UniProtKB/Swiss-Prot annotation:
GO terms for molecular function: RNA binding. Keywords: Cytoplasm, mRNA processing, mRNA splicing, Nucleus, Ribonucleoprotein, Spliceosome. Residues 6-78 form the Sm domain. This is Small nuclear ribonucleoprotein Sm D3. PANTHER family: SMALL NUCLEAR RIBONUCLEOPROTEIN SM (PTHR23338). It is found in: Nucleus; Cytoplasm, Cytosol. InterPro entries: LSm4/Sm_D1/D3 (IPR027141), LSM_dom_sf (IPR010920), Sm (IPR047575), Sm_dom_euk/arc (IPR001163), SmD3 (IPR034099). The gene is snr-1.
Length: 136
């Protein structure tokens, strides 16, 4: 079982509030988010749907499948949700770490500036494009 990410947690926090969402077909739904699932399936109550041609219609309840949602507009009050405070603490520890974070050992062999070995023999036995070295 995988844990849900912060965007899905924020979506669950928006339950009971007015949200606006647009589907991939271009309809815009505005209503009270009754229920949201981890796969972004949403149930809206007291909804106004605006179709692509500009017509609008009032609906009591509507269920929208999660993979048909293009984007959602959530209430501004969710900016103060506790999940964002936890993210802020986690990012403070990562400032200045670069892309890889703390542990960079063992992440590759760094062969960009090493001389080529030849045909795979041990070091010193062959040179690229030439005969083996002779030390006599």
């Amino acid at each position: 079982m995988t844990s849900v990410g912060v965007p899905i947690k924020i979506l669950h926090e928006a339950e009971g509030h007015m949200v606006t969402l647009e589907t991939v077909t271009g309809e815009v739904y505005r209503g009270k988010l009754s229920e949201a699932e981890d796969n972004m399936n949403c149930q809206l109550a007291e909804t106004v749907v605006t179709f692509r041609d500009g017509r609008s219609h009032q609906l009591d309840n509507v269920f929208i499948r999660g993979n048909k949602i293009r984007f959602m507009i959530l209430p501004d009050m969710l900016k103060n949700a506790p999940m964002f405070k936890n993210i802020g603490r986690a990012q403070k520890g990562a400032i200045g770490m670069g892309l890889g974070g703390l542990d960079q050992r063992g992440r590759g062999r760094g062969t960009a500036f090493r001389r080529p070995m030849g045909r795979g023999g041990p070091r010193g036995m062959s040179r690229p494009g030439g005969a083996p070295t002779f030390r006599g």
